[in-house]
Amino acid sequence: MSESVVAGAGHRVPINPASRARAASSAVLTRFPLCPNATPEPTAVFRNTAAGTGVALGHNGNLVNTAELAARARDEGLIGTRCPAPATTDSDILGALLAHGAADSTLEQAALDLLPTVRGAFCLTFMDENTLYACRDPYGVRPLSLGRLDRGWVVASETAALDIVGASFVRDIEPGELLAIDADGVRSTRFANPTPKGCVFEYVYLARPDSTIAGRSVHATRVEIGRRLARECPVDADLVIGVPESGTPAAVGYAQESGIPYGQGLMKNAYVGRTFIQPSQTIRQLGIRLKLNPLREVIRGKRLIVVDDSIVRGNTQRALLRMLREAGALEVHVRIASPPVKWPCFYGIDFPSPAELIANAVQDEEEMLEAVRHAIGADTLGYISLRGMIAASEQPASRLCTACFDGKYPIELPGETALGKNVIEHMLANAARGAGLDDLASDEVPVVR
C-alpha cells in the first residue's frame, strides 16, 4: 500500500490513511515554482479513479502542449469549461488524464496511452495502491535515476538523493522509458524512441555537486569549467573566490588553472534557500542579503576574481558586488561558469521571458558584455564559451539541450499562443473574468519571443 505524498511546501496528502501500517511505497516531491506568479500550493497531485483507487503523481519539468491536454481533459468532462481549481498546473492535468484512463483499464495502460501524446520535458513518478511508476520524456531533458535498497527500490531526480537514503545506484531511467515497480520487482516498457537532449544547466547550477548525470560527476564538471574559464578569460588579481554553493567548484578550478590563490570570501547562511529559484524579485533580493555575507578580513584590499555559475537577471551579482566593494575589495572581476543566458526555458527552469534576461537586451557580443558589466558594477566580465562548457561536461553536444544559451529548442514548441509556460495561470485569470478554455487560442495569451 502507498502511504502518502509529501509536497515541497510541506503539505501531506493521504492516499489511504487506513493503510499506514501496511505502507509499502511513498513519494516525496520538492519542486520550485516554474512560473513567476506561482503560489505555495501543494506541488503533488492526487486523484481518484472512477473505481475509487487513489493515484498520486509528482512531476519535474514543464510541458509545451498544456493547452492541448487541458482541452482534452475538458472534452472528457474532467475539467469544467471555466477550469476551476484544483486544475492549476500541467501536473494536475496529467493526473486527471491518468486517473480517467485508469478507470477503464489499468494505470499502466493509461500511462502507455497518454505518454506518447505528452510533449515537453517531464520526469514523472506516479503510483496507485500497488505499483510505483516512473518515466522520462523521450528527450531525457531532466535526469531520473533508479536505486536499490536492501528490501526495495528508489527513484530519484538526483543520484545524491540515493546516497542520502542509503540506496545504491542501479542505472539512469532511459529517455522514453516507463518503469513499473511492484512486489514482483521492476519491469521496463518503451513508450517512445529516445532522442537524448539532457539539460546542460543541470551541470552548471541545478544539480547537487555530489550527483552524477549520464555518468559524469557534477562537481568534476564544474571544476573543469573553472579551469577552462581561466584559460578563456584570464585576468590579473590577488584572490579567487566563488559564490556559494554552485559557483565554488568552478572557482576552485579557476584558481588551480590560473595559479591565483583561492579563498573563501563569502559566508553562506545554510538556512536560506537558493535565490534564483525564488518566485518573485522582492524575495530574491532579500534572499541575497540573508544568504551571503562577505569575510572582510579576507577580501579587504584585494583584487578579486568572483566566479559565479550564471547570470540570469543580474540582480544577485549587482547586490553582491556592492557588498564586496563596501567590504573593501579594490577590484572585482566577474567570471561566469556558463555562457550568457539569452533565451527562455520551456522545459522546467524559470527563465520566463527574454525581457528578464539581462544578456538578451543587446545582440552584439561585445556590446552585451559591456552592458552587463556596467549593470552589475564589475571591473571586468568574462563568460565561458558554449563550446568550453560542453567540453567540460564530457557529453556529446548532440545529446545536450543548450536552448537557453543558443535558442535551439530540441522539443518543437507549438504556436506562440499555446505555449505551456504560463498557460494555466492565464486560463484561470480568464475564468475569473468569465472566459474559459476556448480563449486559449486568443491573442491575449502571453507571448514569449
Predicted regions mapped to residue ranges:
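Conserved short alpha-helical segments that host acidic/polar catalytic motifs at enzyme active sites
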Residues: M1-P175, A180-A237, V243, E331
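Flexible loop/turn segments at secondary-structure boundaries
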Residues: N65, Y133, V141-R142, L162-D163, ...
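PRPP-dependent phosphoribosyltransferase catalytic core
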Residues: L115, N130-T131, R148, G166-D172, ...
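Phosphate/diphosphate-binding loops
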Residues: A161, S168, G176, E232-C233, ...
